[in-house]
Structures are given as C-alpha cells and as structure tokens.
C-alpha cells in the first residue's frame, strides 16, 4: 500500500487541462525518497512542472511493487522502478516512457563473507525481497563468478529477507547484500572503510538493470499523450540542470527533503548527479538484452510481442 494514501481509490482515466488550471498528478517511487529522484525535486523547485500546469505529488511506497499495482488500478499517473520489474512478467496496462537514470551494481560481500563463498561454506545474503526473479539472478551472479574462477561450490547460498540497509546488514554479520547500487552502497562501503568484494552484473556479463524508468498506464497514456510528453520533457529539462550543477543538486535535495546534511549523503549525491540521462534513453532498445537474458534463464515467459507492447512511442 502506498503511504499518504487518502487519495487512493479514485481513478483518473482522462485528465483535461483547461484554461491553465493545474492538474494534480501523482508519482509513486520505487522506494523511499532519495537522490535517484532528484529530477522530480528539481522540476518542482524550478517550477518546471508548475509552468506545464502540473501539480506533482511524490508518494513513497510501503512495498517495492506498489507503484505498478496503483498504476494498473488507475489510482496514480506515473511511477518509477527498475526495468527488470516490467520485464519479469507481462503487464497489460503498464508502459515505460523511457530510462532516466542508470548506475551499476550487484552483490557486495564482506571480506569474510567472500572468503566463506570461496571456501565452500554456508553463505547468507541479505535482500529486501526474495522471489524467483531476484533470487535466480543473485544466484546466477555467484555461479558465473565462481565459474570464472574455476571454483566448485557445494554448500547452499541463502537469501535472507531483510530491509534495504545493505551495508548495516553486512556490518551486523550477514555475508553479503543484494541488490546493491554503486552510487549508494558502493559509496557507503568506501566511506565506512569496509573491506568488501563487489560482484556486479557487468563483471559476469549479465545485462545491467540497476536503473530507473518512468512508467505510466496504457489507459492514461492513450487519453493524455500530451501530458505524458510534457511530464517527460519537464523531467529531461530538470536533468539538464542537475548534471551541470552539483552545488544546486545538493541544495535542492536537502531543502526539499528536510534531511540533515551528512558526509554520506553528500557523497551519494556527488556520485549520483552525473548518472541521470537526458534525453531519456529508449527503453525498448536498451532493455532488449535484459529481456533476452530473462527468457533464456526462465525468469520471464513474456513473448516478443508482449515485450514490445510495454514501451510507449513518445
């Protein structure tokens, strides 16, 4: 369920903008508000959305998949999430408007945890979720890495459901954490001075999906194409500002979130602000290799036609 959800349950199949009246638009994030969402904070701060007659409400979810659920039900207009979650199964009423952010990532092991992996001991990996999709990929990362080292492993690797505080979980004794992003956990592990072993997707030739797309519903898009185009262009305009002005990125993040300034958050923003993409990357083309990987590894069973239908031509 989405937080601040008093507005939910009201469907918005058609929104018409008349006489410059601002439209209330709801965007559900994939997790808690963080620097990956800077474009939306900047677009609000610079009145980019306001000038487009868009009154944006940003919503944090209780669950990682809430945004997709609310899009499907017509309760919100936009959502952000990793492209993998679009591809892992067919969504008849969800489409991507493009890819606006990409980092790199995978599994981060503690020094001792990685030694246990190589020594064929039981290994415990923390993850915010455990399901066939994410577990299959995590175990495939390990399998491919060990094959590259010609290491044979017999003992079990367990995925332990924890929260998303990956580095804390490693410090608390778990052997590794997944899915870690370089601009977050990579930064934090360096700042903490931890001795870790990173096994990222690109290290084992698995297509990257440590990224965020902007999603809407097909029904909303069909009835509001101009608004969707405006929202995308407004976000792209905000990204142009961010990637050229670290000081402003720092300012707007703290001013909009009211968070206390910390060395960790400063470092995360400094690593993040250059990773935004403008114009958005074409997701249909960009995630094709990821789609092929999910089909080959029986993670997804959607057809090529279904895959192609989940991306907007915009």
Give short role names for the model-derived ranges.
Residues 24-159, 175-179:
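Short, glycine-/small- and polar/acidic-enriched structural segments
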Residues 224-296:
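Secondary-structure end/capping motifs
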Residues 3-4:
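Basic polycationic patches enriched in arginine
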Residues 83, 165-257:
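Pocket-lining segment of extracytoplasmic ligand-binding domains
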Residues 12:
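Cationic, low-complexity basic patches in intrinsically disordered or flexible, solvent-exposed regions
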Residues 149-158, 257-270, 300-307:
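Short, surface-exposed acidic
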Residues 291-314:
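Conserved C-terminal helix/tail region of periplasmic/extracytoplasmic solute-binding proteins
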């Amino acid at each position: 369920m989405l937080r601040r959800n008093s507005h939910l349950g009201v469907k918005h199949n058609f929104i018409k903008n008349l006489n410059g009246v601002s439209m209330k638009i709801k965007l559900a994030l994939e997790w808690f508000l963080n620097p990956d969402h800077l474009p939306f904070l900047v677009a609000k701060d610079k009145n980019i959305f306001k000038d487009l007659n868009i009154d944006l409400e940003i919503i944090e979810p209780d669950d990682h998949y809430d945004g997709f659920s609310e899009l499907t039900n017509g309760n919100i207009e936009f959502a952000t999430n990793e492209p993998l979650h679009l591809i892992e199964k067919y969504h008849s009423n969800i489409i991507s408007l493009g890819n606006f952010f990409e980092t790199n990532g995978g599994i981060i092991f503690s020094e001792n945890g990685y030694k246990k992996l190589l020594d064929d001991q039981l290994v415990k990996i923390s993850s915010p979720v455990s399901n066939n999709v994410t577990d299959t990929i995590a175990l495939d990362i390990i399998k491919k890495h060990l094959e590259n080292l010609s290491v044979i492993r017999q003992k079990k690797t367990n995925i332990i459901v924890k929260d998303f505080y990956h580095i804390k979980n490693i410090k608390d004794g778990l052997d590794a954490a997944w899915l870690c992003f370089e601009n977050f956990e990579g930064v934090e592990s360096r700042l903490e001075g931890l001795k870790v072993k990173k096994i990222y997707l690109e290290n084992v030739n698995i297509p990257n999906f440590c990224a965020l797309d902007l999603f809407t519903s097909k029904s909303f898009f069909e009835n509001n194409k101009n608004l969707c185009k405006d929202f995308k262009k407004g976000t792209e305009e905000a990204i142009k500002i961010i990637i050229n002005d670290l000081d402003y990125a720092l300012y707007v993040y703290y001013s909009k979130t009211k968070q206390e300034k910390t060395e960790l958050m400063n470092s995360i923003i400094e690593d993040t602000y250059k990773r935004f993409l403008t114009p958005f990357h074409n997701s249909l083309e960009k995630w094709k290799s990821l789609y092929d990987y999910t089909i080959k590894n029986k993670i997804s069973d959607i057809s090529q036609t279904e895959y192609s239908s989940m991306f907007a031509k915009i």
